[in-house]
Amino acid sequence: MPELPEVTTVINELKETVLNKPLDQVQVNLRKVLKNIDPQLLNKQLKNQFFTDIKRKGKYIIFLLSNGLYLVSHLRMEGKYFFEERGSKFNQKHVLVEFHFDDGSQLNYHDTRQFGTFHLYEKLEQAAQLNKLAFDPLEAGFDYRKIFQKAQNSKRKVKTFILDQTVISGIGNIYADEILFASKINPETMVDQLTIKEIEILCKNATKILAKAIVMKGTTISSFSFKKDHTGGYQNFLKVHTKKDQPCSVCNQLIVKKKINGRGSYFCLNCQKITTKVSTKLNP
């Protein structure tokens, strides 16, 4: 699933190709991707309008329209956007939504798994899925002290905790593994056992790693592509994710893979030891 760096990379590419181009037609080839509007009404609302800006919240893409509406897109597992110039040939298979512009070019939403979603809103406050999202590590409101407070009230493993989009938004399985490795935290550590200093280090690494991944245009492990024939580059910098049975870059011990709450997790047992918080209370 595309995570914060991949979604940001997609948005950066879209901004270069589709802003301020009048829409002539929106063609929906698979009805189920529209969650709160039918294809005919979507076409009516977008026809003759244009995208004035494109923003991100967590892993969501938000298209701002010239008529004040908001089109909210989530790529889910395999969603991709491909821009096509007028007259260009492309494979129509798996193109679920087509945004046709009046200059003959078009933006295609491509999704082999068909899990992606679209919502249209008059106001973003109506988008419940956005309202429940926490700050992401690149936002000004991201505060390790607030994360620590949430951790103190949680009985989950740290890997599961940081994947919760109501705790930290934008992080998925790939970057969770990398952030925990950089922070020397075992993914099975109970999060309420982490000290505030450990949470601070984790949050700083989250910001650092996600920012670097954006510079590298995301991570391509299986299929991520931000435009035709272009893939990300951060996979070349991964330390543990997908590295099962390969030597750790720090200590040379072999990286292990284990399912944690249903998610394949990669880590180094030597560099990422489970520790418990030492009590500062005096013995009676």
From Swiss-Prot:
Which gene is the coding source of this polypeptide chain? mutM
Mind telling me what this protein is named? Formamidopyrimidine-DNA glycosylase
Q: Tell me what organism the protein belongs to.
A: Mycoplasma genitalium (strain ATCC 33530 / DSM 19775 / NCTC 10195 / G37)
Please provide the record's keywords in A-Z order.
DNA damage, DNA repair, DNA-binding, Glycosidase, Hydrolase, Lyase, Metal-binding, Multifunctional enzyme, Zinc, Zinc-finger
Instruction: List the InterPro entries hit by this protein, alphabetically.
Output: DNA_glyclase/AP_lyase_DNA-bd, DNA_glyclase_Znf_dom_DNA_BS, Formamido-pyr_DNA_Glyclase, FPG_cat, MutM-like_N-ter, Ribosomal_uS13-like_H2TH, Znf_DNA_glyclase/AP_lyase, Znf_FPG/IleRS
Q: Where are the zinc fingers (FPG-type)?
A: 239-273
| Top-level lineage group | Bacteria
Function noted in UniProt: Involved in base excision repair of DNA damaged by oxidation or by mutagenic agents. Acts as a DNA glycosylase that recognizes and removes damaged bases. Has a preference for oxidized purines, such as 7,8-dihydro-8-oxoguanine (8-oxoG). Has AP (apurinic/apyrimidinic) lyase activity and introduces nicks in the DNA strand. Cleaves the DNA backbone by beta-delta elimination to generate a single-strand break at the site of the removed base with both 3'- and 5'-phosphates.
Please state the span of the N-terminal signal peptide per the UniProt entry: none
Indicate the family of this protein.
Belongs to the FPG family.
Which residue positions are annotated as catalytic? P2, E3, K59, R263
Q: Which SUPFAM superfamilies match?
A: Glucocorticoid receptor-like (DNA-binding domain), N-terminal domain of MutM-like DNA repair proteins, S13-like H2TH domain
Q: How does it assemble?
A: Monomer.
Q: Where does DNA bind?
A: H94, R113
> Reaction catalysed by this chain?
Hydrolysis of DNA containing ring-opened 7-methylguanine residues, releasing 2,6-diamino-4-hydroxy-5-(N-methyl)formamidopyrimidine; 2'-deoxyribonucleotide-(2'-deoxyribose 5'-phosphate)-2'-deoxyribonucleotide-DNA = a 3'-end 2'-deoxyribonucleotide-(2,3-dehydro-2,3-deoxyribose 5'-phosphate)-DNA + a 5'-end 5'-phospho-2'-deoxyribonucleoside-DNA + H(+)
Cofactor annotation comment: Binds 1 zinc ion per subunit.
Obligatory cofactor(s): Zn(2+)
Q: What does the record give as EC number?
A: 3.2.2.23, 4.2.99.18
Question: What biological-process terms (Gene Ontology) are attached?
Answer: base-excision repair
Pfam entry (one): Fapy_DNA_glyco
